[in-house]
């Protein structure tokens, strides 16, 4: 059994930090964790007691993740000559990447909690990281891709089922590199889990657009001398709502 379920009784008061709304057969759970908000939409016939138990399990899982995060950050900062990350750009960037990875891990672990409660249709979002379970009614979940520095032109939404979506952006302003060339501004990745999508997105940001395998379920936002170019991987095309 997962630690969150053991902590349910102890952490029931913590559930008050979150919220729950119901619209027909849909339940909406929300709260704050890991420096951001989370939103869970699920389709399940939950009674009030079951809903409270689920909220307690979610808060227990998030409390465990917060503890793990604090421990890891403490160990990381202890190895540096100063704890002022603002004076160390590399450390600040590392901590930001760590937080993104933690948020992706949290989404996967919340999805696992929903699975333990027998919930087959749900969507979890935390810090912009999304994972879907089953469908939204009779259709896959419908998600909007992050604009990531683009203009106001509409982008085709995604239809996802049992998959995760992560979008990561390059830090800094959208400027051309010295000598021209191209720069990858942002990448969106669809994968089976949020951690897989997050890891792949960060690998692509480091490697650049020329190293991308365009047969995968990815979207690249590339800055070129001629302007911004949007590239969709072939595995992503069937998921786009045209």
Regions found by a protein language model. Give the residues of each.
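Mature catalytic core of soluble alpha/beta enzymes
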Residues: 2-242
